[in-house]
Amino acid sequence: MFSKALKSFPPRANWAMKPQVLQARFMASVAKGTPKPNSAIFAPERATFTIRDGPVFHGKSFGAKKNISGEAVFTTSLVGYPESLSDPSYRGQILVFTQPLIGNYGVPSAEKDENGLLKYFESPSLQAVGVVVADVAEKYSHWTAVESLSEWCIREGVPAISGVDTRAIVTYLREQGSSLAKISVGEEYDADQDEAFVDPEQINLVAKVSTKAPFHINPGNSNAHVAVIDCGVKENILRSLVHRGASITVFPYDFPIQKVAHHFDGVFISNGPGDPTHCQKTVHNLRKLMEVSQLPIMGICLGHQLLALAAGARTIKLKYGNRAHNIPALDLTTGRCHITSQNHGYAVDASTLPSDWKPYFVNLNDSSNEGMIHKTRPIFSTQFHPEAKGGPLDSSYLFDIYLDSVQKYKQSQAAFQPGRDSRPSPLLADLLGNERVGVQTTIGTQSTPESVAPVLETPISPTMAAAA
């Protein structure tokens, strides 16, 4: 179909004619019913990117026509903008890309894999509140693409600006630190009349991205049952567990997991956005979990920070954070260096770790803590993302280490209790339903596949509420 629209354009030798003529010819072809091109940028409005107490940058809008504010952060990732922008860890932030050209391979479809997990995104929606690029591709080309970056931003209601000096923006953020900023769309910009700067870290962002109700994923060949605490979990984290044979039950971030821990073989704490100190309920629940259970535990990113707080350590805010796909992290147990994918503005203060914990990884760029491990128990966590998406898979083996400890724990429990009834208790059965081979993926706006029965229609059952 698109070839019909292309035929309305003059031969390549005549493409030197005025852009207005080309646009007029194309619009005429559209009026006849031929499809539009893969870009929504014909007459972009003026847009302004303003850093609080800092410079003002003027460019062109290619997203939603509205004004927003948030924390301005930057990523040096060369590729993976669909994964980055859909990462719940970016909730409340305006993402500045250092890569000069963004959008050249478009935005893929919301296709799901055999377990109902999104193939190309890390959540069902665009999580960043704003997008800043030097140059946006008006034409895209990739076999998975179904729309342009501009069309995605407009559909998701996210403002975006191009044509600004991202080198100057990143230099400012690097020198002054992550700052509050806003994107204003319109020809007339008046700083005095524009909306105030809003600090997203003053609110509990995790509560906005965490699942509202527990759900279950059973790959059909399950060899272990893992409880996942959803603080804004990425799809590829769930996929990394399921593809290794784990059956998982995902709980809201503030669910009292210690109440049902004995029904699981391990606990996993996910990534998420914002200040970890906002999640005091989660910290309390993790502390109680470690007191009453010997379950293997693994945490990633925010999960690493929450586990550290539960252990008694402290967290600190970094000047401008680490957001890239090429950050070196040293494994202190083996001396090996891994190239890692990272997205965080806070870090664990390794000097405050209790005596029964030790650092696991260290950042070779800024010497910040990248992981910790318990000296005697199967508990560890990393600040970086071993599941990547995007980024390298150097450290994906950590999922194997974790699930190996889960298997050993499961076998030890079977040895101690050889006659233990493997059927779930009424409490857990009430939560999960009787038979759930398949997936229910009600994360945010995700819908349940028609072929799979729903796991939980209401947020929490009366039995579960009483137990909590």
Curated annotation (Swiss-Prot):
Subcellular locations according to the entry: Mitochondrion matrix
Major place of residence: mitochondrion
Any Pfam family matching the protein: CPSase_sm_chain
Segments forming domain Glutamine amidotransferase type-1: 225-412
Active-site feature positions: 301, 385, 387
Family: Belongs to the CarA family.
Protein name: Carbamoyl phosphate synthase arginine-specific small chain
Species, as recorded: Coccidioides immitis (strain RS) (Valley fever fungus)
